[in-house]
């Protein structure tokens, strides 16, 4: 879904990439990266088919380099743990072209973005996460779950992009 008109490549600038989970059905969740640009956000969905294709591509790369099993396994884990970083250098059209589910939303189409963060547990075993709900001016709401903890820098980034439309709760 494309809610905006194309812009020149010079206006692109990724502010931050957030990792989230999107619930498709009762037992089906997929990873979704929220790529925050200066003028819009882009949702990049990692569907099972897309993940399988990316894993196959990386496996072929690892095999072609002659890397052994253990180093290859470590390389594959590293690939997926830093996968979100690739979006820091991609343009919105390139992200949208990856998967038909991907969508871009200009900030002026967002009536409210609710970011709720929590931290549980003690020093040794704490967990963090929360909700990221994007309410659109057409009445639709995109509901995501995230694993980010409260961060003043994140709050500041979201505040600078969304202003009064941001509801940040910890």
What label would you give each PLM region?
Residues 2-14, 23-32, 36-170:
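Acidic, Ser/Thr- and proline-rich intrinsically disordered linker/docking segments
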Residues 17-18:
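Divalent-cation-coordinating short motifs within acidic/hydroxyl- or histidine-rich contexts, strongest
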